[in-house]
A protein has these predicted regions:
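Conserved glycine-rich cofactor-binding loop
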Residues: 11-13
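Conserved glycine-rich Rossmann-like NAD(P)H-binding loop of the short-chain dehydrogenase/reductase
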Residues: 25-41
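The beta1-alpha1 cofactor-binding region of Rossmann-like NAD(H)/NADP(H)-dependent oxidoreductases
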Residues: 54-64, 97
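Active-site helix of classical SDR
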Residues: 115, 153
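Residue(s) in the substrate-gating loop at a strand-loop-helix junction
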Residues: 137
Length: 245
């Protein structure tokens, strides 16, 4: 039976690379994001792709997107909760409340709303079950300077992952988290020229091909439901994570 996955933040970067990997593997792929043009570019003309324009922070928009996919497919096997955003590096006292609220809305509330929609589908479908994969970050373990909004949401994603794992047991819903470090995307490109470090210096950082992330998500998704990659860290080995700070 052909499997299906919904990928949020699928218009570019990690999401687009992951969509490409799953389409090539024969999955039906729902590409979720706010920009229809970037979603269409990522989907190409692949017959198994479905563009789902959606604001992940809006409950009605999320329900509509997941409902559209279910109407077409009748089943959802995997959710990759990937949508997220950062903010300019500032200390807590320099961070305005609108920036804080927007990062929380996308990174945390959006992940919860999409997980909630997927959980309901996976719980009610037959055969029951499915898999939710949350994009954490190495920032779920160690912060960068001036990253209070982003780091806080990524720590919270770990709590969401654990809660979904526990609540999903009786319904064969597995949940895992992939913590990614310096995959080369548009957002990470500036790291090649210089990023603030914990000692106050600005230094370039090592990066890795985003395809390694896509392949890792695929590995997690392909596990049988009696096995689960609970947490995985995929990172550029020379980036300042181990020993950061």
């Amino acid at each position: 039976m052909q499997k299906s996955i919904i990928i949020t933040g699928a218009g570019r970067g990690i999401g687009a690379a992951t969509a490409k990997t799953f389409l090539e593997a024969g999955y039906r792929v729902g590409l979720v994001g706010r920009n229809e043009d970037t979603l269409k570019a990522a989907a190409g003309d692949h017959p198994n792709s479905m563009v789902l324009v959606c604001d992940v922070g809006d409950p009605a928009s999320v329900d509509q997107a997941f409902g559209t996919a279910m109407h077409a497919w009748g089943r959802l096997d995997v959710l990759f909760n990937n949508a997220g955003r950062g903010s300019p590096p500032k200390t807590a006292d320099e961070t305005d409340i609108d920036t804080w609220m927007d990062v929380v809305r996308v990174n945390l509330t959006g992940s919860f709303l999409c997980a909630r929609a997927a959980f309901a589908i996976m719980r009610s479908q037959s055969p029951q079950g499915g898999r939710i994969i949350n994009n954490g970050s190495v920032s779920a373990h160690a912060p960068r300077p001036g990253s209070a909004p982003y780091t806080s949401t990524k720590h919270a994603i770990t709590g969401l992952t654990k809660s979904l794992s526990l609540d999903g047991r009786r319904y064969d819903i597995a949940c895992g988290q992939i913590d990614i470090g310096n995959a080369l995307t548009e957002m990470v490109e500036p790291m090649k020229t210089g990023m603030p470090q914990a000692d106050g210096s600005i230094r370039p950082e090592a990066t890795m091909d985003v395809a390694h992330v896509a392949n890792s998500v695929f590995h997690m998704a392909e596990m049988p439901l009696d096995a689960n990659v609970q947490f995985m860290t995929v990172m550029a080995p020379k980036m300042p994570f181990i020993g950061r700070g």
